[in-house]
Amino acid sequence: MALLFDSACIAIGEQTLYQGFTWQDLELPQWCDDIYFTGNVRRAIAHQSPSLVHRLIELIDHHAVHFALVPAEAPLCLLLPEIKERQSVAEVLKAVQQKLPTSTEHERTLFCYPYGSASFLVALKRIAQLANSPYGCWVVALDSSEVFCSGIEHQSFEETKTDSLLLARTVDTGTGLAFSPVQIDLHSQAYASGSDSVMPSLASLCKQELTDLCLPLKGEESEQWQNHLPRFSPWITQQTRYHFNQLNSGELGTGGGLLNALVLYEQQKQAPNAHFHALQLDCDPLGMAAGVLYRWRSEE
């Protein structure tokens, strides 16, 4: 199995990037200093929202034209920030369904993954199964920041906070990304971070040099994965490339995992490397961590 990744749109703040995007196309974030927060932001909606769930629904309305790109018959996986209340998940899911094209002859297959930054990798096995459909599997990642919600104390931050929606199509083809079993774990009393379990598991699966590493930069999480890099000796070399995509995009949250896969796919498609072997780790502080190894499979 090898997955083709086709980015339909990447909406970050007020800007939407389409196929063939580069980071040079992304406009600089806006500096904001008001009664709510101080920092760089990329907002699609200028006002503060009552809650994160309410803001997600507002973003769905804002991006209605992009949801219309999904064929009525295509299966879809919806990736969301960590939302523990079932009713809140149901409200977001209903808002998405109202924007999607419908068919009287076909009921859409739709799965929801409200697991934050790890959502894409948690969903990856299901995405691969659905990618066999005639329309492929479509993936929507939607997220925002709680600093865009009223009722919080004023705070300052260094990371760029974003409203974001990523929409991509995946197809099971003879050429594309092939992936190892996804490793998943939660923060617990036994582990300071889910990464403390996921990284050793990935190290045990790694049997060849790593050409690329896609890793998060989130405070203590960075320290956690750094502590485990020696486990990958001798597979990490001076030629290994490190990808910290959020430095360009800002905090995408749920969309970060999908973006990592899109970046790796586009890189390999444009500049093929016969030895391509990549590691992707997505995690949230005190939340879920997920990791995977990719190879490039070609039918040629």
Annotate each language-model stretch with its function:
Residues 1-135, 141-144, 152-300:
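Conserved "HGTGT" condensation-loop signature of ketosynthase/thiolase-family condensing enzymes
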